[in-house]
A protein has these predicted regions:
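Structural beta-strand segments of beta-rich domains
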Residues: 28-32
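Structured interaction patches on ligand/partner-binding surfaces of diverse proteins
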Residues: 106-139
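Bacterial signal peptide processing site
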Residues: 24-26
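Short beta-strand segments within Ig-like beta-sandwich modules, predominantly Fibronectin type-III
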Residues: 85-89
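C-terminal motif of bacterial Sec signal peptides marking the signal peptidase cleavage site
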Residues: 19-22
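Short, ordered, surface-exposed loop/turn motifs in non-cytosolic proteins
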Residues: 40-80, 100
Length: 139
């Protein structure tokens, strides 16, 4: 009887440890929180902002160090993605821990090194900002 009781306690402790360690860490000190919307279309003629249609982005979002994006440019996009922090956006929502620094926010398919999509984080700061990323499919 005591052996069975001991096994129940061990099992219960194991379950609690597994549950505690498998939970996602949502609180952090330095990082980014926001919503990312994405749209694409012809830019001939240019589509005014008010006429553009955006959707909440679902997919991988990369936080590329600005200095690396500036030096490697679009030809180095694959290497930049491999070295960058990335998270999966769901219904546009992004919540990510980042080190202090300056980052350009890019989606999986498009290199968009634009000041409009750049964030600068100081240690201990969480930037909360929403972005609308528009990609021209023709010029």
């Amino acid at each position: 009887m005591h052996v069975l009781s001991g096994l129940k306690k061990v099992f219960l402790v194991a379950v609690v440890v597994i549950l505690a360690t498998s939970c996602e860490k949502e609180e952090f000190i330095t990082g980014y929180r926001g919503t990312i919307e994405f749209g694409e279309g012809s830019c001939i003629p240019g589509i005014p902002e008010s006429a553009r249609k955006y959707e909440k982005f679902n997919g991988r979002v990369y936080f590329v160090e600005k200095s690396a994006a500036d030096s490697l440019g679009e030809p180095g996009f694959l290497r930049l993605k491999l070295k960058s922090t990335s998270v999966e956006a769901r219904n546009g929502k992004v919540n990510v821990e980042l080190p202090a620094g300056t980052f350009v926010i890019m989606t999986e398919k498009y290199f968009v090194n634009d000041p409009e999509f750049t964030i600068t984080l100081s240690k201990g700061e969480i930037v909360q900002k929403d972005f609308k990323i528009w990609v021209c499919t023709s010029f």
